[in-house]
Amino acid sequence: MLKDLILKNRSYRRFDESRSIEREVLRELVDLARLSASGANMQSVRFYLSNGQEENNAINECLKWAGYLKGWSPAEGERATAFIVMLKDKERKSSTAYDEGIAAQSILLGAAEKGLGGCMLGAVDREKLHAVLGLDEKYEILLVVALGYPCETVVIEEAKDNDIKYWRSEDGVHHVPKRSLDELIVN
Protein backbone atom coordinates (compact mmCIF):
# COMPACT_ATOMS: atom_id res chain seq x y z
CA MET A 1 0.00 0.00 0.00
CA LEU A 2 1.23 3.50 -0.77
CA LYS A 3 0.88 4.65 2.85
CA ASP A 4 3.31 1.94 3.98
CA LEU A 5 5.86 3.12 1.41
CA ILE A 6 5.39 6.75 2.50
CA LEU A 7 5.92 5.76 6.15
CA LYS A 8 9.10 3.90 5.15
CA ASN A 9 10.33 6.91 3.15
CA ARG A 10 11.85 9.09 5.86
CA SER A 11 14.66 11.65 5.60
CA TYR A 12 17.62 9.42 6.41
CA ARG A 13 20.89 11.20 7.11
CA ARG A 14 23.13 8.31 8.20
CA PHE A 15 23.98 5.45 5.88
CA ASP A 16 26.11 2.31 5.75
CA GLU A 17 28.96 3.71 3.68
CA SER A 18 30.36 0.21 3.07
CA ARG A 19 27.38 -0.62 0.82
CA SER A 20 27.57 1.00 -2.59
CA ILE A 21 24.75 1.74 -5.02
CA GLU A 22 25.24 0.83 -8.67
CA ARG A 23 24.77 3.49 -11.34
CA GLU A 24 22.03 1.34 -12.91
CA VAL A 25 19.98 1.66 -9.70
CA LEU A 26 20.32 5.46 -9.92
CA ARG A 27 19.16 5.29 -13.55
CA GLU A 28 16.12 3.24 -12.48
CA LEU A 29 15.24 5.87 -9.87
CA VAL A 30 15.58 8.71 -12.37
CA ASP A 31 13.39 6.70 -14.74
CA LEU A 32 10.63 6.84 -12.12
CA ALA A 33 10.99 10.62 -12.10
CA ARG A 34 10.94 10.64 -15.91
CA LEU A 35 7.66 8.71 -15.95
CA SER A 36 6.03 10.95 -13.31
CA ALA A 37 3.74 13.89 -13.92
CA SER A 38 5.32 17.10 -15.19
CA GLY A 39 3.82 20.58 -15.52
CA ALA A 40 2.68 21.05 -19.13
CA ASN A 41 4.66 17.83 -19.77
CA MET A 42 7.80 19.97 -20.14
CA GLN A 43 10.00 17.40 -18.38
CA SER A 44 12.41 20.20 -17.58
CA VAL A 45 14.37 18.67 -14.67
CA ARG A 46 17.78 17.19 -15.51
CA PHE A 47 19.84 14.86 -13.33
CA TYR A 48 23.51 14.40 -12.48
CA LEU A 49 24.35 10.97 -11.01
CA SER A 50 27.21 10.25 -8.62
CA ASN A 51 28.12 6.95 -7.00
CA GLY A 52 31.92 7.18 -6.83
CA GLN A 53 33.53 7.74 -3.44
CA GLU A 54 35.83 10.57 -4.48
CA GLU A 55 33.06 12.54 -6.20
CA ASN A 56 30.64 11.79 -3.34
CA ASN A 57 33.15 13.17 -0.84
CA ALA A 58 33.43 16.37 -2.90
CA ILE A 59 29.63 16.69 -3.08
CA ASN A 60 29.36 16.14 0.68
CA GLU A 61 31.60 19.15 1.26
CA CYS A 62 28.95 21.33 -0.45
CA LEU A 63 26.02 20.24 1.73
CA LYS A 64 24.53 21.36 5.03
CA TRP A 65 22.68 18.57 6.79
CA ALA A 66 19.81 18.70 9.31
CA GLY A 67 19.04 22.37 9.91
CA TYR A 68 17.56 21.72 13.37
CA LEU A 69 20.70 19.82 14.45
CA LYS A 70 23.19 22.70 14.37
CA GLY A 71 26.64 21.78 13.10
CA TRP A 72 25.72 18.15 12.51
CA SER A 73 26.75 16.15 9.45
CA PRO A 74 27.19 12.42 8.86
CA ALA A 75 30.39 10.93 10.25
CA GLU A 76 32.89 9.09 8.09
CA GLY A 77 31.45 5.63 7.44
CA GLU A 78 27.88 7.00 7.62
CA ARG A 79 27.82 9.19 4.53
CA ALA A 80 25.60 8.76 1.49
CA THR A 81 26.98 6.39 -1.13
CA ALA A 82 25.18 8.03 -4.03
CA PHE A 83 23.74 11.38 -5.01
CA ILE A 84 21.28 12.56 -7.61
CA VAL A 85 21.74 16.27 -8.26
CA MET A 86 18.58 17.77 -9.71
CA LEU A 87 19.13 20.52 -12.26
CA LYS A 88 17.18 23.10 -14.21
CA ASP A 89 18.23 23.76 -17.80
CA LYS A 90 18.03 27.57 -17.95
CA GLU A 91 17.81 27.48 -21.75
CA ARG A 92 14.51 25.57 -21.72
CA LYS A 93 11.03 26.68 -20.78
CA SER A 94 10.46 25.32 -17.32
CA SER A 95 7.93 24.19 -14.77
CA THR A 96 10.56 23.15 -12.23
CA ALA A 97 8.86 24.86 -9.30
CA TYR A 98 6.50 21.87 -9.26
CA ASP A 99 8.44 19.26 -11.15
CA GLU A 100 11.45 19.11 -8.83
CA GLY A 101 9.24 18.09 -5.89
CA ILE A 102 7.33 15.53 -7.94
CA ALA A 103 10.57 14.05 -9.30
CA ALA A 104 12.29 13.99 -5.90
CA GLN A 105 9.33 12.26 -4.27
CA SER A 106 9.23 9.66 -7.05
CA ILE A 107 12.97 9.01 -6.64
CA LEU A 108 12.70 8.66 -2.87
CA LEU A 109 9.65 6.40 -2.97
CA GLY A 110 11.47 4.20 -5.49
CA ALA A 111 14.52 4.17 -3.24
CA ALA A 112 12.40 3.15 -0.24
CA GLU A 113 10.89 0.32 -2.27
CA LYS A 114 14.44 -0.93 -2.98
CA GLY A 115 15.44 -0.82 0.70
CA LEU A 116 17.39 2.40 0.28
CA GLY A 117 16.97 5.61 2.20
CA GLY A 118 17.47 9.16 1.12
CA CYS A 119 17.30 12.80 2.01
CA MET A 120 16.42 15.86 -0.08
CA LEU A 121 18.90 18.65 0.53
CA GLY A 122 18.22 22.25 -0.37
CA ALA A 123 20.95 23.70 1.87
CA VAL A 124 23.65 23.47 -0.78
CA ASP A 125 26.63 25.65 -1.65
CA ARG A 126 25.40 25.78 -5.24
CA GLU A 127 28.29 27.78 -6.63
CA LYS A 128 30.87 25.42 -5.16
CA LEU A 129 28.95 22.29 -6.20
CA HIS A 130 28.51 23.64 -9.73
CA ALA A 131 32.30 23.97 -9.97
CA VAL A 132 32.98 20.59 -8.31
CA LEU A 133 30.76 18.82 -10.85
CA GLY A 134 32.06 20.86 -13.79
CA LEU A 135 28.51 21.64 -14.88
CA ASP A 136 27.73 23.69 -17.95
CA GLU A 137 26.59 27.24 -17.08
CA LYS A 138 23.15 26.49 -18.51
CA TYR A 139 22.40 24.26 -15.49
CA GLU A 140 21.08 25.60 -12.20
CA ILE A 141 21.21 23.30 -9.17
CA LEU A 142 17.75 22.77 -7.66
CA LEU A 143 18.13 20.00 -5.07
CA VAL A 144 20.50 17.24 -4.08
CA VAL A 145 19.08 13.82 -3.21
CA ALA A 146 21.45 11.82 -0.99
CA LEU A 147 20.99 8.05 -1.10
CA GLY A 148 22.30 4.99 0.71
CA TYR A 149 21.41 2.04 2.89
CA PRO A 150 20.08 3.59 6.12
CA CYS A 151 21.88 2.87 9.38
CA GLU A 152 19.60 4.86 11.65
CA THR A 153 16.09 4.59 13.01
CA VAL A 154 13.64 7.37 12.21
CA VAL A 155 10.30 7.51 14.04
CA ILE A 156 7.25 9.68 13.45
CA GLU A 157 5.41 11.04 16.46
CA GLU A 158 2.66 13.54 17.15
CA ALA A 159 3.88 17.12 17.54
CA LYS A 160 3.47 18.52 21.05
CA ASP A 161 2.88 22.19 21.81
CA ASN A 162 3.19 23.02 18.09
CA ASP A 163 6.89 22.01 18.15
CA ILE A 164 7.81 20.42 14.82
CA LYS A 165 11.61 20.45 15.21
CA TYR A 166 13.06 16.98 14.68
CA TRP A 167 15.59 15.76 17.22
CA ARG A 168 17.83 12.83 18.15
CA SER A 169 17.57 10.96 21.42
CA GLU A 170 20.65 9.74 23.28
CA ASP A 171 20.26 6.30 21.69
CA GLY A 172 20.61 7.88 18.23
CA VAL A 173 16.95 7.55 17.21
CA HIS A 174 15.81 10.41 14.98
CA HIS A 175 12.38 11.71 16.09
CA VAL A 176 10.16 13.56 13.61
CA PRO A 177 7.11 15.35 15.08
CA LYS A 178 4.13 15.66 12.72
CA ARG A 179 1.19 18.02 13.00
CA SER A 180 -2.22 16.39 13.44
CA LEU A 181 -4.44 15.78 10.45
CA ASP A 182 -7.10 18.06 11.96
CA GLU A 183 -4.57 20.90 12.13
CA LEU A 184 -3.79 20.54 8.43
CA ILE A 185 -7.36 20.40 7.14
CA VAL A 186 -8.86 23.89 7.33
CA ASN A 187 -12.58 23.10 6.92
Feature names for model-found ranges:
Residues M1-N187:
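Acidic, surface-exposed loops and disordered segments
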